């Protein structure tokens, strides 16, 4: 967790009451479709810069563990999602090892493919919740998703250059 954006992501404070948030902000934070697809409307090319990818133990989960089953190993993927080479979002995906069977094994082979390009082509994708959060002046969210009923937790932090902030103002 050496990248500064990951430290900010881990510092997100999440909240359930969204009634005071601006509708244009909520349009981003509560988006149920692919964030990759949303970003593609604001640039020529969306790319992934890999920060970390590999198995970790439960000690790497901290409070995230309350949303995932207890297992000895989890697949962790930490990335920067960039629009035309500019980092717009830092993402952290935690996948219990038991989720990585059948078609979901492909989650380990995404490489620099955006997660959304895989997730939103699956007919078995469901979402339990989206929870908005904030770290200093930056907005983020976490989502518990399921593929064929098997969980994965995605946490995203919108970086200062993200189009979210251009629309928010």
Curated annotation (Swiss-Prot):
Substrate binds at residues 35, 77, 115, 156. It catalyses: chorismate = 4-hydroxybenzoate + pyruvate. GO terms for molecular function: chorismate lyase activity. It comes from Cronobacter sakazakii (strain ATCC BAA-894). Monomer. Pathway: Cofactor biosynthesis; ubiquinone biosynthesis. Disulfide bonds: none annotated. One of its GO terms (biological process) is ubiquinone biosynthetic process. This is Chorismate pyruvate-lyase. Its EC number is 4.1.3.40. One of its GO terms (cellular component) is cytosol. It is found in: Cytoplasm. Keywords: Cytoplasm, Lyase, Pyruvate, Ubiquinone biosynthesis. It is an enzyme of class 4 (lyase). Removes the pyruvyl group from chorismate, with concomitant aromatization of the ring, to provide 4-hydroxybenzoate (4HB) for the ubiquinone pathway. SUPFAM superfamilies: Chorismate lyase-like (SSF64288). It holds the Pfam family Chor_lyase. It comes from the Bacteria. InterPro entries: Chorismate--pyruvate_lyase, Chorismate_lyase_/UTRA_dom_sf. Belongs to the UbiC family.
